[in-house]
Curated annotation (Swiss-Prot):
Gene from which the chain derives: FADS1
Record organism: Papio anubis
Pathway recorded for this protein: Lipid metabolism; polyunsaturated fatty acid biosynthesis
Tissues/organs with expression: Widely expressed. Expressed in brain, liver and thymus (at protein level). Isoform 1 seems to be more abundant than isoform 2. Expression of isoform 2 is very low in spleen and not detectable in skeletal muscle.
Topological domains annotated Lumenal: 143-146, 289-305
UniProt motif Histidine box-3: location: 382-386
Domain topic, free-text comment: The histidine box domains may contain the active site and/or be involved in metal ion binding.
Family per record: Belongs to the fatty acid desaturase type 1 family.
Gene Ontology annotations for the cellular component aspect, listed alphabetically: endoplasmic reticulum membrane; mitochondrion
SMART domains, sorted: Cyt-b5
Reaction equations catalysed: (8Z,11Z,14Z)-eicosatrienoyl-CoA + 2 Fe(II)-[cytochrome b5] + O2 + 2 H(+) = (5Z,8Z,11Z,14Z)-eicosatetraenoyl-CoA + 2 Fe(III)-[cytochrome b5] + 2 H2O; (8Z,11Z,14Z,17Z)-eicosatetraenoyl-CoA + 2 Fe(II)-[cytochrome b5] + O2 + 2 H(+) = (5Z,8Z,11Z,14Z,17Z)-eicosapentaenoyl-CoA + 2 Fe(III)-[cytochrome b5] + 2 H2O; (11E)-octadecenoyl-CoA + 2 Fe(II)-[cytochrome b5] + O2 + 2 H(+) = (5Z,11E)-octadecadienoyl-CoA + 2 Fe(III)-[cytochrome b5] + 2 H2O
BP GO terms, sorted: unsaturated fatty acid biosynthetic process
TM ranges: 122-142, 147-167, 268-288, 306-326
Protein name: Acyl-CoA (8-3)-desaturase
Amino acid sequence: MAPDPVAAKTPVQGPTPRYFTWDEVAQRSGCEERWLVIDRKVYDISEFTRRHPGGSRVISHYAGQDATDPFVAFHSNKGLVKKYMNSLLIGELSPEQPSFEPTKNKELTDEFRELRATVEQMGLMKANHVFFLLYLLHILLLDGAAWLTLWIFGTSFLPFLLCAVLLTAAQIQAGWLQHDLGHLSVFSTSKWNHLVHHFVIGHLKGVPASWWNHMHFQHHAKPNCFGKDPDINMHPFFFALGKILSVELGKQKKKYMPYNHQHKYFFLIGPPALVPFFFQWYVFYFVIQRKKWVDLAWMITFYIRLLLTYVPLLGLKAFLGLYFIVRFLESNWFVWVTQMNHIPMHIDHDRNMDWVSTQLQATCNVHKSAFNDWFSGHLNFQIEHHLFPMMPRHNYHKVAPLVQSLCAKHGIEYQSKPLLSAFADIIHSLKESGQLWLDAYLHQ
């Protein structure tokens, strides 16, 4: 359907509401004009994307689409946010238009919204501050124990190794806590979440909060959607991911890597390398290129603290060795945990599906246990986390049975597996997609 030359000009809001069809909204998904729909209201976000507090890309990923459910999922004070959005309002959907596109399951969406209302009434969106305080204290204890190990027992091999393990655990657990704060799930106000987020991710880890939010919010908005989820940006230059994209790549006769061997070289360029050889340097480029000076200042305090506490005990050379070992161990831990929920799942281009279908087809869980909860920072409840990204993690297990019932009713697969099986499935999926690429490359 060709765009109407009259309608192509963005109308000015007047006293009488302007009405639009889904076709008109869908046409505004490019670089010049971007519209989206929330609760049947049509908003022109073309200029606003650059000022969006959550980042320009995450909101742009919903241009031309209904964004009601992600809007609810990502914003705490929705009434206040909508007041600020009034200046972007240009009209609403015509009365004869459905509330969302035909690619979305109406019954599933309606029932999920009822489930969300139930979850809020049950108080499952409210944080237990004692839980998070104890969690922070356990991180500080691990961090302090690492230094005390060297101070008390000296710098021989075994104390050095124990220090590295304790410091790695502290770094990983700080990573899980900053994840909670980045999702605004610890405090009732955004201000306090942001402030403590800077402390945990910046001072305790040496990572910029703005970089994490920029990347992670996109992942949650469109998980496993190529071109929109930065977590799968390693396709196609390093890995061929997913059945559909791998076959597509093979048919195009593109070969950046020997993908049929990717399940082998994953062990070399995946878990061991991501943090020490990429994240470690890229975060500095990010904050300097985007002039995020507050983030840079927090990061510098992390390195000053480490230098002042460890160099007097170890000397500079041994300290640098310790730092690299910690980042190496952290990288392995981080990559296996963060990839086990998504890489084995469906990966495709954005098909503009409803919120529940988008999250469930791209996400799986790992069975609950005290160790799995701690080891993964409760990311073993990835399905619940993706459906309710602002829910405090200590409530995931409470909402899980309700989510399972919703999935069973609508014939949606709810995957949960043992931890080691989840790790193995990463390798199995890489092997399968690599073979699919090879078959398409050679024979299609």
